[in-house]
Each structure stands twice: as C-alpha cells, then as structure tokens.
C-alpha cells in the first residue's frame, strides 16, 4: 500500500506527527505495536512544568493536540514559579492517564486521512539514498514518500528491576530490536540512554493525613488557546507531599550492591535532572531528606504515582524503602518502578527539519533523538509531521529560530550540539526567554499554524483581536504622560504608589514592581473592556519593556550573523587560525550559517570571527573571477 507519510510509533511524538501530517492533507499511516496504548503516558501522570509548559503552549499555538487534550483530561492545574517573573513561570497539569490515552486514541482513529496498523516495523526500505517505505514483523510492506520514526524507548528496550532484566519497550510491551538493527545498517550512529519510572501505590493503603496537601490553583488556567478560559472549571484533585528520611536512605545505601545502576548492569546514561532515588542518595549524601510527591493517576484516584522515587532496585527493597516514608508505612505496591535502557540516534545527524542528513525522506522525532519528556517529544513530532508534509507539497520548511520559540531552541540544541544524556528543556537554555513566554506563544506562533491549515479561522481571529488590544494598550501607555500636579499625585496616593517629580510616561509608572492589574485598570480605564489575556500581556510588556527592547536589539544583531551563509565550497582545512577540533566540528556538522556554527559546542566566538573573515575573502575572490 502507498502512503504519503508513515509514522512509526503512537506515543506523544507519533501522535503529533501523524495528526499534523493528516490534517495538512497527507495520506498518513501510523504503525504502532499496541493500538490500545496510543497516547499512553509511560511515566508520570503530568503534562507541562518549568519550560515544558512553554513547549505545550507552543505546540497548541501551532495547531497541535497535546494542550487541548490536557485541558479536557486534567485533574489538577497549577502555575509553577507564580511568584517569579513571567519568563520562568510554567503551567503544569496532573492528567487522568486513562482518559488522556483514550481521548488521544479516539482522536487519532477518527482523523480523516489517517490510518492505524497494529504491527511492528522491522526494516526500513531504501532506494538509492532515500527511504521509500517499511516492512513489518508480519511481512507487510508499506510504501511512503516520507517516514517519521518516533519509537520512544522501544529501540532495543531493556527493563531492569534489580537483577531481573527483560526486553521491553515499556512494561508489558515488546521491544523493537530489528528496527534498531535496520537503522544501524543504514550508517546512522546510535547511542544508549537510560530512564526510569516510579512505583504505583494502592490508594487504600496510603495515610494521606500524615502528608502535606498540595491543591490545584483556585483559578486554573488552561493550556490551550482554544479552551474557553471563562468556562474552564475542571474537577481538581489534590496531590500530597512527604519526604524520605534517614531510615529510607539507610535502606537504599545498604542495597547499592543490588542496584543495576551501580553493578554495571545498566550501560546507558541516565537523565541528569531526573535521577533515580538511589542515584540521589549516592550523589547527595549531605541531604537529610528528599521531596516525594504523591500524585493521583486518574480521577478515581485508585493508584498514586510516587514522584521522586524513580528506581530500578529489586521489588523487596522498593517496598521496604517506600514503607519507611511518612504516610506510606502500610503501602502496597500495584506496579513496581523500573529503569529502561534504549537506543537513540545521535541527533547531530539530523537537519533542522528533523530529516536525516544521510538518508532522504527519513525523519526522527522524540526520545529517539536523545530527549526526555512527553512535551519535548510532542514538539519534535509536530515539527517532523509539518516538515514532512511541506516537503511533499514542495513548500519551504518550517524552521523556528531560537528567538521565536522554545521548540526552536530544542531542535537547534539537538542538531547542532547533540547530547550525551537525556536532554530536558529548561528556561535557562533560551537566550531570549523574556520574549518566549507562555502567555505570548499564540502571538508568536499561531500565524504559522493558521497558514499551515492547523489552526482554524475562529481561533486565529481571536488571537488577532487579542493582539490588537495589546498594541492599543501599549500604545496608550507609551504615548500618554502624567505630570506631578495635585490630581495626579492624589491618584497615585490612592493607588498606594509613590510620587512622580517630572513629566512621566504611563509605561514607566506601570513598570514599577508594586503596580498591579487592578491599578492598571484605574490608571487606564480604556483597557477595562479588554480580554483578561490581553490585559495580562499589557502589564507584562509594560513592566519589562526596557529589558524586552534590549533582547530585541540582541536578536537584530543575531539575525545579521544568522544571514551570513557559509559557502558549501569553502575549504575549511585551508583556514589558518582555527584549531583542528574546530575544523573537524565544522566539517562534521556542516552548519549553513555563521549563527548555526556559533551554536556548535566548542566553537568559540574567536573562531566565528576568523570564519567570518574567510567567508568575506572567499566572496571577494568569487567576484574577481
């Protein structure tokens, strides 16, 4: 059978890739090992978080599905870092894992142009230097113009629970060994990574009265720009907080000799920022306790996820350490935690479109590219699906810049710097994070989503109206002035704001740390009729207008550098002043521009200056010939 696009895998990356492709008119096939598990959340029952919430909002602004499904299946919504600046705030939701999976599966199966097959892809079919289709374990052959690999942890997946090892892509599901061999046979460099998950506890056996309650926000904010914020009133369940203690640490330390992480049984590199509990105890011996978040997995709350206790220790040790924790003294484990090793593709072998450099029409997205997290996977899947469809339509690819989106930062980091450990998104990775906030993701990216046909007209026009209100409000603040007369001073005093001594632009008054939304509505009554989202934007943009302007100027300088193309026929070896290491990296990565070169790990500013000089010399020689 012939398709436009084949997506291998039905996880978070696979779903977004398949939906984007099908919604853009491509005849799409999703091949997945177990159709019932489309959209399954393999690890924690949550979407979003610091920087991850940004990704979900950006996915939504481009027309992706994750945010909307989270809003419909979420059972707790919180804004993390709410007391900090807007650039580092992050939306997070606990999801009902069952309903999330069922909803995603239903959406996939009901989407026009999208078919699903429950099979396992064993081999990629190659003609010349391009992929042309796949062969499955059932010996079925499917041809396609593009193939997107979104296999998650399934490539040679190996589960570890103490001394027990089991080939699996996820607990209870087959590993994909043949496809890993197929990728390797095509000359792609594969590495080995490791991640893990926590035990799930029977709710009946937990004493919640001995734990701290962590409720959701009183006025929850949805992820999706398509969700009606005024009517958003989800049923929310609390999470709970408890802590490890000295006894917990003793149990774990006395069983290091049984931990696959320390016995040499596990070879893959684990996530630095989400270590297992045994790794935490080993690395942070000075810590007297560690947070444990007890999170409901479904609305019925029959099982709880013990977040913070990811482990591959044997079952008897897991039970003992869990029962040493306050509130879990009588806990019964429904599912034990485990570690899983899996193959990944070195992402420096990919273009910014996520197409492989050496094999045409083959794309990789998600954990196969070395990332960790549902949100990072979904973002890559969406971009791979979009770019595969655009390539078939013979249209320009969508490559988001580091100044446009966290998705742009994510992909640029992967394809230029690569990763030796599971890559997780942080706000600190974004140079222009004050411009890349959650609250303005729609303004930044929805024009792309609308142009692609992934965002409907009604949603797009809602964004346009919001944008117009923001521009009108900021224009008022920047071009309206107040003078220190009696009326003005009385107004400021009534708002509990300090005096002004000179003629002052309203924007500078609003920029004060003490200035709130309520005060803004008094000072500028015209904005009272604006939407809540627009008013929030006006307040943020006004408060940080000087810093925002500085970042915009930095971006202009970056664009000048970005536009300097590196000629394909430039002889890198002939450039004196560059170290051999820099030359090797430039030849290996083949960056198209100076900016791309500057993002490669180990390429110094001095090397960029030298390269810039030689490019100018190269261009002059061309002109004189």
Curated annotation (Swiss-Prot):
Pfam family, one: SAM_GIDA_C
Chain positions recorded as FAD binding sites: 9-14, 121, 176, 367
PROSITE patterns, per database record: GIDA_1, GIDA_2
Cofactor requirement: FAD
Domain of life: Bacteria
Gene Ontology CC terms: cytosol
Molecular-function GO terms, alphabetical: flavin adenine dinucleotide binding
GO terms of biological process kind: tRNA methylation; tRNA wobble uridine modification
Record family assignment: Belongs to the MnmG family.
Subunit structure: Homodimer. Heterotetramer of two MnmE and two MnmG subunits.
The name this protein goes by in its record: tRNA uridine 5-carboxymethylaminomethyl modification enzyme MnmG
Gene label: mnmG
């Amino acid at each position: 059978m012939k398709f436009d696009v084949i997506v291998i895998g039905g996880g978070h990356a696979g779903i977004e890739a398949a939906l984007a492709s099908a919604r853009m008119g491509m005849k799409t096939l999703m091949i997945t090992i177990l159709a019932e598990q489309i959209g399954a959340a393999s690890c924690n029952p949550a979407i979003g978080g610091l920087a991850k919430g940004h990704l979900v909002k950006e996915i939504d602004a481009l027309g992706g599905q994750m945010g909307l499904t989270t809003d419909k299946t979420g059972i707790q919504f919180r804004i993390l870092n709410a007391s900090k600046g807007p650039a580092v705030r992050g939306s997070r939701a606990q999801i009902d894992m069952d309903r999330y999976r069922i909803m995603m599966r239903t959406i996939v199966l009901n989407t026009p142009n999208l078919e699903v097959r429950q099979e396992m892809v064993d081999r990629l079919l190659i003609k010349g230097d391009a992929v042309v289709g796949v062969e499955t374990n059932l010996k079925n052959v499917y041809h396609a113009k593009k193939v997107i690999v979104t296999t998650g942890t399934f490539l040679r997946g190996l589960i570890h629970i103490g001394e027990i090892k089991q080939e699996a892509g996820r607990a209870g599901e087959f590993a994909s060994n043949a496809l890993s061999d197929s990728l390797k046979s095509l000359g792609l460099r594969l590495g080995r990574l490791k991640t893990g998950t926590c035990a799930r506890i029977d709710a009946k056996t937990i004493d919640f009265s001995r734990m701290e309650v962590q409720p959701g926000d009183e006025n929850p904010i949805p992820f999706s720009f398509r969700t009606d914020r005024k009517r958003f009133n989800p049923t929310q369940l609390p999470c709970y907080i408890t802590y490890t203690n000295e006894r917990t640490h003793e149990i774990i330390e006395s069983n290091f000799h049984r931990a696959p992480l320390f016995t040499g049984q596990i070879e893959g590199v684990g996530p630095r920022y989400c270590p297992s509990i045994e790794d935490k105890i080993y690395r942070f011996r000075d810590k007297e306790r560690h947070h444990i978040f007890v999170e409901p997995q479904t609305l019925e709350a029959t099982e709880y996820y013990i977040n913070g206790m990811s482990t591959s220790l044997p079952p008897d040790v897991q039970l003992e350490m869990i029962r040493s924790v306050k509130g879990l003294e009588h806990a019964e484990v429904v599912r034990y935690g485990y570690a899983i090793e899996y193959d990944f593709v070195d992402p420096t072998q990919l273009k910014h479109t996520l197409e492989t450099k050496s094999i045409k029409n083959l794309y990789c997205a998600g954990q196969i590219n070395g990332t960790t997290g549902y949100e990072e996977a979904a973002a890559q899947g969406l971009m791979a699906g979009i770019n595969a469809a655009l390539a078939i339509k013979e249209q320009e690819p969508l490559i988001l810049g580091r100044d446009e989106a966290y998705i742009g930062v994510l992909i640029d980091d992967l394809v230029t710097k690569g990763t030796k450990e599971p890559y997780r998104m942080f706000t600190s990775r974004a140079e222009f994070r004050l411009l890349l906030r959650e609250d303005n993701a729609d303004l930044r990216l929805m024009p792309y989503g609308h142009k692609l046909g992934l965002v409907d007209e009604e949603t797009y026009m809602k964004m346009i109206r919001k944008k117009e209100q923001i521009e009108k409000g900021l224009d008022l603040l920047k071009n309206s002035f107040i003078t220190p007369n009696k009326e003005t001073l009385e107004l400021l005093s009534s708002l509990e704001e300090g005096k002004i001594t000179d003629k002052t632009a309203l924007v500078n008054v609003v920029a004060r740390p003490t200035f709130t939304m309520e005060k803004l509505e008094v000072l500028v009554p015209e904005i009272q009729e604006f939407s809540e989202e627009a008013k929030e934007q006006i307040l943020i943009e006004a408060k940080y207008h000087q810093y925002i302007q500085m970042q915009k100027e930095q971006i202009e300088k970056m664009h000048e550098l970005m536009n300097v193309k590196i000629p394909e026929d430039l002889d890198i070896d002939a450039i004196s002043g560059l170290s051999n290491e820099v030359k090797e990296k430039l030849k290996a990565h083949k960056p198209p521009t100076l900016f791309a070169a500057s993002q490669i790990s180990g390429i110094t500013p001095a090397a960029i200056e030298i390269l810039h000089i030689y490019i100018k010399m190269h261009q002059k020689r061309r002109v004189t010939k």
